[in-house]
């Protein structure tokens, strides 16, 4: 497999996605990640600019997400070197099924699984974003005007490894879901 990108529906990859794919192929041939990278591929990639800093979002197929997460720390480090310091995040390529209404209920014989609901997908995106850190708590603050602010508590042990990326995580999550989120590293309760 010379290319590392398989898009849904067999559509062609654009130039940016091809460059990401090429970087993964180079990593596979040159580094000690060869064995782990051989079976892996991505479904799409996006580049977004936030506060004059660019970030790269790489979508991976759900069955391969666990395998990507095993090597994610090293893979992110290598890709960030290659793409001159742009922050790289890996996210599982999930599908959201629409909420069944009275009209559509007849057409769908199957019940919508919990993993395909909007809430579940958005929570999972948040977990993928902050990997390798773990979410230890979450507070949702609803303001008087109805807007929500999500406070996510991350594991204090991982503060040194991901603290510099917190702004990227906030802006990527806002771009993908439209939800405001802040990250904190609270002291563990005893």
Curated annotation (Swiss-Prot):
GO terms for biological process: ribosomal small subunit biogenesis; rRNA processing; translation. GO terms for cellular component: 90S preribosome; cytosolic small ribosomal subunit; small-subunit processome. Keywords: Ribonucleoprotein, Ribosomal protein. Pfam families: Ribosomal_S7e. InterPro entries: Ribosomal_eS7, Ribosomal_eS7_CS. GO terms for molecular function: structural constituent of ribosome. Belongs to the eukaryotic ribosomal protein eS7 family. This is Small ribosomal subunit protein eS7. It comes from Manduca sexta.
